[in-house]
Amino acid sequence: MEKLPCVYILAKASHGTLYTGVTSDLPGRVWQHREGLIRGFTQRYGIKRLVWFERHDSMDSAIIREKRIKRWPRAWKYDLIHEHNPSWRDLAEEFGFPPLLLK
């Protein structure tokens, strides 16, 4: 399977706790988060819903974008999600995952 660098945002609920990450295998990383295999913040707070992602040509550009977004105020991240996914639906459906319901 071809690797595709992505920046992504997971949410626990609409306008809830967010996690911003970067990966070269978005479906694989989503699966890891959903299964609780990644120790730390997302596992501790049950953050599993993919609400935004952005593809990049290289990991370097994806990492730069991730670092920028992580420095943004929460409101800017909400605006970014709302601009591309106003209903905060679970975008993991695009990769064949069953949708997670909003809490």
Listing of model-derived features with the role each one plays in the protein:
Residues L26, W72-P73:
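A short acidic/small-residue loop/turn micro-motif
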Residues M1-R39, Q43-R55, D60-K67, H84-P86, ...:
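GIY-YIG nuclease catalytic motif and its immediate N-terminal context
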Residues A75-I81:
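A short, polar/charged loop-to-alpha-helix boundary motif
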